[in-house]
């Protein structure tokens, strides 16, 4: 075993996290978004500066713990990428309450609210069941993209749209989700439970299944024009495209088609670098849609 230094080159440094990535993607598509996020200590202040420099509208919640830093390592010979995400700060009860209040206040200025990512330590698993009625009270619609124990707990409250990747969907139903048929069973379960109006289960290189009360739509991913470099941020790019098009008046299927294309475009950039809008819109024309009745 060789032991020594591994030299690295810093290619890209940016503010990140699910909601921030979505806000960046919305801006890339020409939409308007406000990122609501926590910021703690020195790294939290740097996060605020990065967002300001990038011109992303944001509302920080100051917390006692230090904001975490995540890393994507891209190995240039194998072209493999490794997403390293350390544990984040723990929020206390007061910070959790202030977080709810801040989300509700920001929601009033937007027709759609995206709740993205796993919950930080300190927040109860049922946090999103508290978020959902507050969002409804503002007249906004909630799009939920979460994972871990918060995912099944969130089913107790209806939202407008839910996105699960195949791993999260498998966690929900207790079995592997690998095909469009598997995804259809998951989406049917979510719709039948009244947990959502629109259910989206993503299937990696296959694409995604978008389901509503009117039927199921298989959205087959377009062929990539180049070698995939990283899947970090692909899900956030998808949600950004979907919410942008929903806010512009598109129906969920057309919005999801651009979402599948944005996820594909995200894979063509290394690390967490954002997708190219023109590439995403070009790939959207190659997304094949197969409509199935319920």
Where are the language model's segments positioned?
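Conserved phosphate-binding/catalytic loop of the ribokinase/pfkB sugar-kinase fold
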Residues: 73-109
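Glycine-rich phosphate/adenosyl-contacting loop at the front of the ribokinase-like
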Residues: 1-36, 45-49, 220, 225, ...
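Short beta-strand scaffold segments in enzyme catalytic cores
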Residues: 24, 69-73, 207-211
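Conserved phosphate-binding/catalytic region of the ribokinase-like
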Residues: 152, 180-294
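Short beta-strands and strand-loop turn motifs
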Residues: 83-85, 110-118, 145, 163-168
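Conserved phosphate/ATP/ADP-binding segment of small-molecule kinases
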Residues: 126-216
């Amino acid at each position: 075993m060789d032991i020594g230094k591994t030299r690295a080159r810093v290619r890209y440094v940016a503010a990140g996290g699910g909601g921030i990535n979505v806000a960046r993607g919305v801006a890339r598509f020409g939409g308007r978004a406000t990122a609501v996020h926590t910021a703690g200590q020195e790294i939290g202040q740097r996060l605020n500066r990065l967002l300001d420099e990038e011109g992303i509208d944001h509302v920080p919640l100051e917390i006692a713990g230090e904001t975490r830093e995540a890393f994507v390592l891209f190995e240039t010979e194998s072209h493999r990428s490794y997403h390293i995400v350390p544990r984040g700060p723990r929020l206390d009860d007061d910070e959790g309450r202030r977080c709810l209040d801040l989300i509700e206040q920001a929601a009033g200025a937007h027709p759609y609210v995206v709740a993205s990512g796993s919950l930080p330590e300190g927040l109860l698993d049922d946090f999103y069941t508290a978020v959902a009625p507050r969002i409804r009270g503002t007249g906004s619609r909630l799009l939920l993209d979460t994972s871990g124990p918060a995912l099944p707990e969130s089913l107790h409250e209806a939202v407008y749209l839910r996105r699960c990747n195949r791993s999260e969907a498998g966690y929900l139903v207790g079995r592997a989700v690998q095909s469009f048929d598997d995804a259809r069973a998951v989406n049917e379960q979510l719709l039948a439970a009244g947990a959502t109006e629109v259910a989206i289960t993503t299937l990696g290189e296959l694409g995604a299944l978008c389901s509503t009360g009117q039927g199921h739509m298989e959205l087959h991913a377009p062929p990539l024009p180049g070698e995939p470099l990283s899947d970090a941020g692909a899900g956030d790019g998808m949600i950004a495209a979907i919410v942008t098009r929903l806010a512009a008046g598109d129906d969920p299927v057309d919005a999801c088609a651009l979402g599948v294309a944005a996820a594909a475009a995200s894979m063509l950039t290394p690390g967490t670098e954002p997708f190219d809008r023109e590439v995403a819109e070009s790939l959207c024309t190659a997304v094949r849609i197969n409509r199935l009745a319920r």
